Swiss-Prot record:
The active site is at residue 78. Its cofactor is Mn(2+). It comes from Salmonella typhimurium (strain LT2 / SGSC1412 / ATCC 700720). Optimum pH is 7.5-8.5. This is Serine/threonine-protein phosphatase 2. PANTHER family: METALLOPHOSPHOESTERASE (PTHR42850), SERINE_THREONINE-PROTEIN PHOSPHATASE 2 (PTHR42850:SF8). Gene3D superfamilies: 3.60.21.10.
Length: 218
């Protein structure tokens, strides 16, 4: 049984820290937006909510960001689908959800993509960032508990896939999560950055809307 992996970030090491919603292979769009934000790779950090691949056209270029010191990512359900495809040797579920690009690249690029995707077997599902005034928690889809605690083992499928909390909030069933000030999620597309209680949703459908959203932690 796979355990939930956590990572904590020392905010004092960075001038600015941004969280970006699901990139989905929209590498050029990401670079354009970072330039608009005056992002500096030398002093700033970018945290991705996962789903860096699929649906967009620049998947390997996006994955290569994992080699840079200024970019980190939690695991998204699309990275999880890729890992499952590698393990089971059955890529059908991944391919119909956008993973078809993997078979369209050269053998050399496919090997590079495989190596980068396999690093998600060690990457965190949940990232915590504490600044001088607030504690932030980043996960792909949800933190499936009423109270957050670093290292707590929560349901991994819900962290990667669940839409229940957001759908409930959209229907007026809004509840804060204790244990941190702000939770930042991607996964389910919203028209614009959306906040319910202390939860912020920033997947604005980069691959179909051309809108890639960010949240500034510091």
């Amino acid at each position: 049984m796979e355990l939930i992996r956590y990572a904590d970030i020392n905010s004092d090491l960075y001038r600015h820290i941004w969280v970006v919603g699901d990139i989905h292979g929209c590498y050029s769009l990401l670079l354009t937006r970072l330039a608009q934000l005056n992002f500096s790779p030398d002093t700033d950090l970018l945290i991705s909510t996962g789903d860096n691949i699929d649906r967009g056209k620049e998947n390997l270029e996006t994955l290569r960001l994992l080699n840079t010191p200024w970019f980190i990512s939690v695991v998204g359900n699309h990275e999880a689908m890729a890992l499952d495809a590698f393990e089971t040797q059955d890529g059908n579920f991944w391919y119909v959800n956008g993973g078809y690009w993997y078979d369209s690249v050269t053998e050399k690029d496919r090997q590079e993509a495989t190596e980068l995707l396999l690093t998600f077997k060690q990457r965190p599902h949940i990232i915590e960032v504490e600044t001088s005034s607030k504690k932030y928690v980043i996960a792909h889809a949800d933190y499936p508990d009423d109270s957050y605690d670093y290292g707590k083992q929560v349901d991994i499928d819900s962290v990667l896939w669940s839409r229940d909390r957001l759908l409930g909030s959209l229907q007026g069933n809004i509840h804060p999560i204790r244990g941190a000030d702000t939770f930042i999620f991607g996964h389910m597309i919203v028209d614009y950055t959306t906040t319910f209680a202390n939860q912020i949703y920033i997947d604005t459908g980069s691959f179909c809307s051309g809108n890639l959203s960010f949240f500034k932690i510091k």
